[in-house]
């Protein structure tokens, strides 16, 4: 059965694994992105991940899902937010294909999530679907007739930068903002909590977490509307 190295580069963590052609994973792992160290550091992490996989498996291809605007033809990051310094211009596809001589495809992470939902998830069977992701930032993607709608300049769905209440959608409603808010309310180190922690505490009745989530949901409602 064919196997592919699949790597998702997010602003907070890099999730990676070996995906088989029956859409099941042989293995899955996760590591911190350390985004503030910049694009070169991330590319080195990706190279090392593929190198380790290549020693264990015969890889048919490399699939990269990444934060930032991506030229899906060249596999280059054409724009990245300040969350990942010096990531713009990173030639992921070219670098990996040259390093490993294995076909590589690179796409925006939200577009990848939308494709997954469209073909095997909640939007399966639909002709047109919209996927909104809420993580370190906020993004969306549009699928029309089984293909990602990229728009004239490749930026269709980049709703995170939408102006809202004197700021941007993602600077008000992303999960990273939720974490910062709860950390400040509880006077704890931001490194000690994450979104999962906050929602679990809210289920147990934590008033600070409930209040912060309510405020986040209000922002998301405004933005989606």
Outline where the language-model segments fall:
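Two-metal-ion RNase H-like nuclease active-site motif
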Residues: 2-8, 129-132
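Phosphate/ATP-binding catalytic cores across multiple sugar-kinase/actin-like superfamilies
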Residues: 215-225
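Glycine-rich beta-strand-to-loop/alpha-helix junction loops that act as flexible
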Residues: 62-68, 136, 224
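Glycine-rich phosphate-binding loop and adjoining helix at the ATP-binding site
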Residues: 35, 39-47, 61-62, 69-128
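A short acidic/small-residue loop/turn micro-motif
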Residues: 33-34, 85, 155-158
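Short hydrophobic alpha-helix segments
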Residues: 29-31, 81, 152
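Glycine/GP-enriched mid-protein hinge/lid loop-to-helix segment characteristic of carbohydrate kinases
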Residues: 17-19, 23, 27, 38-39, ...
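Conserved phosphate-binding loops in N-terminal lobes of ATP-dependent enzymes
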Residues: 5-66
């Amino acid at each position: 059965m064919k196997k592919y190295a699949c790597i998702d580069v997010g602003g907070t963590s890099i999730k990676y694994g070996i995906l088989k052609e029956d859409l099941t994973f042989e293995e899955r792992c996760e590591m911190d992105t350390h985004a503030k160290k910049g694009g070169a550091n991330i590319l080195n992490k990706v190279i090392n991940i593929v190198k380790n996989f290549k020693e264990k498996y015969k890889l048919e291809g490399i699939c990269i899902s990444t934060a930032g605007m991506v030229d899906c033809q060249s596999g280059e990051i054409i724009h990245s937010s300040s969350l990942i310094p010096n990531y713009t211009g990173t030639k992921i596809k070219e670098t990996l294909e040259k390093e490993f001589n294995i076909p590589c495809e690179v796409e925006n992470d939200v577009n990848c999530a939308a494709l997954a939902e469209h073909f095997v998830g909640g939007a399966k069977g639909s002709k047109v679907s919209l996927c909104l992701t809420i993580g370190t930032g906020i993004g969306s993607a549009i699928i029309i007739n089984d293909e990602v709608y990229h728009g004239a300049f490749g930026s269709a769905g980049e709703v995170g930068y939408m102006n809202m209440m004197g700021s941007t959608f993602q600077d008000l409603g992303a999960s990273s903002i939720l974490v910062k808010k709860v950390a400040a309310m509880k006077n704890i180190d931001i490194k000690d909590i994450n979104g999962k922690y906050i929602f679990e505490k809210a289920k147990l009745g934590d008033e600070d977490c409930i209040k912060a989530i309510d405020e986040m949901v209000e922002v998301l409602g405004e933005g989606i509307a």
